[in-house]
């Protein structure tokens, strides 16, 4: 009977895959027209504990910063090398985030803890961020506070302001998409991971201004550091949490879980700090899952975990109440009938930018067309066709130890004039970063 049921399930999945593949799906976007930029980064400046590079064409420059030493020393180096950029973001951040959070509370008040909604109404975003900082403090490793103090000392910005900025991911709802493709699904049979961050892209968003790839070289515990291995994150100047990140062992990504209807809390470790701990300390998906399961969890997000050890990718439903894990053979989501638009695809795990369960056929259709030959270009075009990844996109090639990044328009006057046009990351040129030249120094 079990064999019969499994056979029926496989037949149904095949029918769903064929129907999605053969359907005329209007994704809304078109392929990305630009070649990948692959020139080397240029060293701009350095301090005792850091080096600053620029990479990209003149109209699409990205910072790369290497950070060495203890948490405080790494923070100090970032604050010194990116002082003007950090001040630029922080000077404009709270006005923008106030508008964004107020709009989100109007839409999603039912998904936020009541005390946070009350705090936003009574004391504004500042009070809500302060309460979040207080509730998460005892669950957050002290190394994060030391690194924030270093950023404050290096940049000249008040520590409390630095701390507040690092609490906002707990309040904001980012759409985002993720894909992990591996083994038979990819051209080189290695693991490729796509992370597309959709995060309120408009000309007034200061988080678009100074995109930065941060490459960490942690000092060993025996030498007074926090230990762990080297890793890279794609973020913006002054932010040390991780929403997009990769090491030679694991890679991570995330997406807000809009459909979660269970209990939430803010007493726990901020999810973006936990994600950074994964890429700094964990060497496999199992180790990352162990960290997730045993963590004091807060809000609800989907997480993506890739592993060089097993050459696989898994998606995680991460919430205060429970953790669920999905691989390429697990119907997604598990608690409702699998939408026909989200068929199981061998050696591919994916979640699109829409509220889940999603009935949008685009991503599955695009992946099916490239199945067996998925490469970096395939994932670049998948993001462009789905029109996902407005602030930034990261693609990790585990086999070659490469990171490909694209960012939304970061140059031009700020505040921008009313007629200022910006271009989202998915429609801009991708930049290749060879992590072999930065890791294992």
From Swiss-Prot:
Keywords: Glycoprotein, Secreted, Signal. Induction: Down-regulated by Pseudomonas aeruginosa, PAO1 strain and up-regulated by Pseudomonas aeruginosa, PA14 strain infection. InterPro entries: C45_proenzyme-like, DCD1A/B-like. GO terms for cellular component: extracellular region. It is found in: Secreted. The keyword Transport does not apply. The keyword Zinc-finger does not apply. Glycans are attached at residues 45, 261, 308, 419. Residues 1-23 form the signal peptide. This is Protein dcd1A. The gene is dcd1A.
